[in-house]
């Protein structure tokens, strides 16, 4: 079964939920696992069925720089603990779209480049909207219950490191420096996340993405 067919299977499961409020879909996975690509493909597949879809990322809910780098710019623990503003993420995006929510939501709280808060004015969701959110630490225990369907993009650490280092070569000045950052900060933080929260275990679908052309899907019983 090819990639498009596997993603269609996941979309089928999501649309069977038939909720009375927007369906909040989470896409987690280690850094450079392919979360954003997967989330975009899933969004396109659901859009083609005529449903309104909104894409969002936890990376638009960063903490200010002073908080993000309080433990050091290369600190794995700092990245894991301090990168994102989970209060804004939950209160401004996830909860308004859940049961008894008012359907008024934001998809961004902080501008990463200017390092200033963002107040763009709230958006109004349709009850049949599907929200697809990607983020590395998305399925932490105090957040995951706010998603109606949870995906974990499962990619081998070495493969993800090579993909990520290639992607970030320009940002870090060389492939070698980018690879070091993945080893020492990003993926070290991901291992903390996996050890503490076991996100794969709580996922409804595990999307094995080490082989981009031939991914596999494992569906897990909802708990």
Give, region by region, the residue ranges found by the protein language model.
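NTP-dependent small-molecule kinase module
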Residues: 1-17, 166-170, 184-223
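P-loop (Walker A) phosphate-binding loop of NTP-binding proteins
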Residues: 30
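Conserved lysine of the Walker
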Residues: 35
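Conserved nucleotide-sensing/catalytic segment adjacent to the nucleotide-binding pocket
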Residues: 54, 63-113
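ATP-dependent NMP and nucleoside kinases share a basic, alpha-helical "lid"
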Residues: 116-170
């Amino acid at each position: 079964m090819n990639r498009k067919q596997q993603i269609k299977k996941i979309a089928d499961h999501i649309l069977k939920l038939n909720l009375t409020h927007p369906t909040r879909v989470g896409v987690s996975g280690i850094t450079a696992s392919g979360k954003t690509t997967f989330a975009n493909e899933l969004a396109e597949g659901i859009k083609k069925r005529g449903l309104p879809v909104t894409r969002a990322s936890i990376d638009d809910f960063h903490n200010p720089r002073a908080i993000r780098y309080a433990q050091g710019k290369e600190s794995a623990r700092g990245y894991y603990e301090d990168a994102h503003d989970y209060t804004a993420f939950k209160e401004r995006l996830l909860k308004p779209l859940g049961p008894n929510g008012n359907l008024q939501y934001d998809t961004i709280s902080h501008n990463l480049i200017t390092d200033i808060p963002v107040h763009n004015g709230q958006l109004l969701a349709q009850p049949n909207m599907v929200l697809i959110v990607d983020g590395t630490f998305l399925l932490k225990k105090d957040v995951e219950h706010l998603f109606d369907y949870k995906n974990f993009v499962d990619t081998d650490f070495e493969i993800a490191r090579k993909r990520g280092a290639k992607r970030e070569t320009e940002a870090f000045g060389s492939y070698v420096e980018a690879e070091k950052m993945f080893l020492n900060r990003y993926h070290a933080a991901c291992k903390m996340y996996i050890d503490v929260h076991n996100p794969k275990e709580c996922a409804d679908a595990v999307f094995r993405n080490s082989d981009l052309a031939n991914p596999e899907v494992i569906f897990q019983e909802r708990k």
